Amino acid sequence: MSVMPSNLSLNGTSFFAENHSIMDKPNEQRTLNVFLFCSTFIIAFTVLLGSIYSLVSLLKLQNKSTISMIVTSLSIDDLISIVPVIIFMLTQWSSDALPQPLCTTSALIYLFQGISSNLKGSLIVSYNFYSINKTETMNCSASKRRVSMVWAILSIWIVSLLICILPLCGWGKYIPTTWGCFTDHASSYILFLFIVYSLCFCLLTVLSVPLTYQLLCSDEQQLLHVNYQEISRGYITPGTPAGCSTATPCLSPVDPVDKTLKHFQNACLSSKAVFRKGVAESSGLEPRCMNNAKSRSFTVGFAQKRFSLILALTKVILWLPMMIQMVVQHITGYQSFSFETLSFLLTLLAATVTPVFVLSEHWIHLPCGCIINCRRNSYAVSSEELKTKHRGFEFNLSFQHGYGIYRISPESHHHDGDGKSTSCHNLLVCEKPYEPPRGGGGGAALAELSTTDSARPGPAGLSATDSARPGPAGFSTTDSARPSAAGVRGEAASGLGRTVEGPERRLSHEEGHKPELTDWEWCRSKSERTPRQRSGGALAIPLCAFQGTVSLQAPTGKTLSLSTYEVSTEGQKITPTSKKIEVYRSKSVGHDPNPEECPNTFADTSVKIHLEVLEICDNEEALDTVSIISNISQSSTQVRSPSLRYSRKENRFVSCDLGETASYSLFIPSNNPDSDINITIPDTVEAHRQNSKKQHMERGGYQEEIQMLNKAYRKREEDGNSN
């Protein structure tokens, strides 16, 4: 084979006289060149489509973020790289040598886009690290940040161009290679390029270590379902809108990923809550502090940071083999055609990953819980988080996926001198503290019963009175008349077998599910300030609770009733000698068969109830199981009532047989059998059954306490409207 003066063989393969031996197998060389040509063509076509798609998508964005501007410039670099690749394909296919000006131009453009991409990868990582960890300096307007970033991008292009024209000034030169044209490996200019790349690589490595944890190391399930929330410090529950006011501390999810969203809301850091898109949609309510569109933009912006980090890491790492090959060939003179070809193809692949960033808006849930899962399955549940930790637990019931774990802390109760409540975290937006009515004795009595202003509008203009009013097929609950150490108000109404009027007024933990039960409402009011409270206005023992929804099948004629209880004691922890437990809260969910249905038919057998289990957080004993028993009143007293027990070991509710006892039990076991707590309350199911019959017979018949309270609410509202 003859060698041309331009060091090109007839098939276009370059040879360097001092450093390279002449190929003895031209057929294999031609085969490798065909493979190289086909691979280059496929990658180049992919880069062309991807860069056009990225540019069009990014330029169509109305609100361009700083990161999207950098990625737009990367798409321009990818589009520019198509020019030298096309020239390289001509070199690989043709047996003629390229003119030196064309070879120099293609090598310069190829090196320019490579240096520019690596520098911009470092810029992306630096900006992400700066914006996340320096939140106090991010108060400047978005327009100023965009202008600064434009100058940074222009500076990178200028620096990259200056580096690439150095061979034209005499330092090194561009010569043909086996795959196209590149710099002469014998020149010290190669070392300069390697130093520039090493600086970018080192900066990217140092900053990406903390960013990887902050942006990628999380569990999306924990984001969409906030399992553990601390109400006393202003944390929200799943499906709960924020109520921001001077009397209400701001809500903020406890989540390592959400903490990194601080830079999005510096102006409202103390008055706004970050809502995940799924939570905002499942609640059916628009947060008061920010609309869904803004919350969506926050989530998309955070996803852009995730994918931009992946994009920067991929681009810089794919250029690493090329840089290693250049330095090794410069120092040792060793050349491997296969490794050199592979390095070239990897640099082309670096230009194909840019469109992944555009898909970040559609892949918000990735890569959390997919690529890296660093979920911590433990939660601090005591008032001092570093002291007492219980094993975290969660549950998914058969037909439901909505759940929440709550904590009521001793520090959560604050009230001012005029008797107004200053802490309220509930599912209805609290815009003002509770103010006792100025009416007569009846109104004064109601002041101890109500935990929220009945005149205050609810989620969709629904007043508290309306939401507390029982429906034809269910009971609604609110505070009992007796004072409590911590008022936790639960409203649960079962619109079972019926269409609830205005379903948008209801809340549900289950996305896309037609709400049939309202979620629990947590609120602290004046009724808590009782002599049983310790000095500081707090619970003697903070309470933990988890709740869920379970579906049961009940034939017509049965009535279901569920009660939940809170427990408290005078000591700071439960001991065998201090076992006096006071039950001061209960609520029921009733279900009556439709009286219009034929008594001989089985109609409306689907019954849905809420279960809520409470445990004492400061109890140092490990709890194996927490049980709440719900009995079903049967038409025949001979049939035993099914009950449910939640087992944390089995992570589910299991059915248990309680015999013929008609009562509700809350069992809190401990390691010491003598210190087990077993609370038994007489069943109220029979009262529901009797009441459901009398409701249709006489309007002034037997009424339960909750119905009388609802009646008082309605009378109070009517008096307010008349005044």
From Swiss-Prot:
Q: Which keywords does UniProt give here? A: Cell membrane, Disulfide bond, G-protein coupled receptor, Glycoprotein, Membrane, Receptor, Transducer, Transmembrane, Transmembrane helix
How does the protein associate with the membrane? Multi-pass membrane protein
Q: Which cysteines are joined by disulfide bonds?
A: 103-181
Report what the protein is called. Answer: Probable G-protein coupled receptor 149
Report the PROSITE patterns cross-referenced here: G_PROTEIN_RECEP_F1_2
- What Gene Ontology molecular-function terms does this entry list? G protein-coupled receptor activity; neuropeptide binding
Q: Where are the transmembrane segments?
A: 32-52, 70-90, 107-127, 149-169, 189-209, 307-327, 339-359
Q: Where on the tree of life does the source sit, at the highest rank?
A: Eukaryota
What's the family? Answer: Belongs to the G-protein coupled receptor 1 family.
Q: Region labeled Disordered — which residues?
A: 451-513
Task of the protein: Orphan receptor.
- Gene (name only): GPR149
Chain ranges sitting on the Cytoplasmic side read 53-69, 128-148, 210-306, 360-723
Per the UniProt record, the source organism is Gallus gallus (Chicken)
Q: Which residues lie on this side of the membrane: Extracellular?
A: 1-31, 91-106, 170-188, 328-338
Task: Please give the SUPFAM superfamilies that the UniProt record associates with this protein.
Answer: Family A G protein-coupled receptor-like
- Tissue spec: Specific expression in peripheral nervous system, including nerve growth factor-dependent sensory and sympathetic neurons, as well as enteric neurons.
Alphabetical list of CDD domains matching this protein: 7tmA_GPR149
Q: Please list the residue ranges that the record marks as compositionally biased, kind Basic and acidic residues.
A: 501-513
Signal peptide range: none
Gene Ontology biological process terms in this record = neuropeptide signaling pathway
